[in-house]
Amino acid sequence: MTVHFIGAGPGDPELITVRGLRLIESCPVCLYAGSLVPEAVVAAAPADARVIDTASLTLDDIIDEIVAAHDKGQDVARVHSGDPSLYGAIAEQIRRLKALGIDYRIVPGVSAYAAAAAGLGIELTVPEVAQSLILTRTAMKSSAMPPGEELTSLGRTGATLAIHLSVRNLRQIERDLVPFYGEDCPVIVAYRVGWPDEDYIHGTLSDIRAKVQEAKITRTALIFVGPALAQTADFRDSALYDAAHALSLIHI
């Protein structure tokens, strides 16, 4: 018996991996967070499968369902949104499974930041503009940021930032990042990426909060910040396409 933590992607059922879909199709038990994973993703479960929306369940409730499946020798598809390794809250589940001696595997999924970049038709790393992407969040009531991971520290890098779970903290984001990126730095708020009502709000550090308030977006949004978002035409081509680079490959 194995628990499969499956990344379902950001919302679009077509973005789940082949492996993830096959496991959902074969597992007799499927646990999914209905608030983040659309029913269309788990519709592929066997007709006689036990399919449970865990949105209202506690961690103990979820583990009880897994233990019950374990006692019956039934594999479990534990379906999470995006990629389970990023803000997936699987670490505490894995800790419980290890203590119980229950086997598990992780199936990666498409993260919201990758799907959003695709939806926007942009690259997040641009030669001589930004070559780093930082995935982060801001402190909320439920969880503080470890020392050194605050935006006032990360902003010093000048990297492209993908800020998760923080759309209600835009005032703080502006305050912390303007000293490093400037008021006119591009910002894009990606709302419900991969869902039918997906939307993108474009602005700058100085005006994005007002635009998001006008759009009445308060959750399920990802915030991109950084000069690479401008996608201007005046950046250097990647060395990957340089003639000398191509010639060096021929002589390897």
What residue ranges belong to the model's regions?
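Short secondary-structure boundary/capping segments
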Residues: 21, 43, 68, 125-126, ...
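Class I SAM-dependent methyltransferase SAM-binding "motif I" and its flanking Rossmann-like core
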Residues: 1, 12, 83-157, 199-202
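Calmodulin-binding IQ motif helices
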Residues: 252
